[in-house]
Amino acid sequence: MKKKPVAQLERQHSLLENPCAYGLLSQFQAAIVVNCFTLNKII
């Protein structure tokens, strides 16, 4: 249980060092959110 937060912090740190990857991830997350909303509206 103690190792999980550390891994998340390391991942966030690497994302801060690589803004390009962070931009891609945020776009990917936004696409998932949009897809979820559209699926909910259809159903």
From Swiss-Prot:
<keyword id="KW-0346">Stress response</keyword>
<dbReference type="GO" id="GO:0005737">
    <property type="term" value="C:cytoplasm"/>
</dbReference>
<dbReference type="InterPro" id="IPR020196">
    <property type="entry name" value="Uncharacterised_YqgB"/>
</dbReference>
<dbReference type="Pfam" id="PF11036">
    <property type="entry name" value="YqgB"/>
</dbReference>
<keyword id="KW-0963">Cytoplasm</keyword>
<dbReference type="GO" id="GO:0010447">
    <property type="term" value="P:response to acidic pH"/>
</dbReference>
<comment type="similarity">
    <text>Belongs to the YqgB family.</text>
</comment>
<protein>
    <recommendedName>
        <fullName>Uncharacterized protein YqgB</fullName>
    </recommendedName>
</protein>
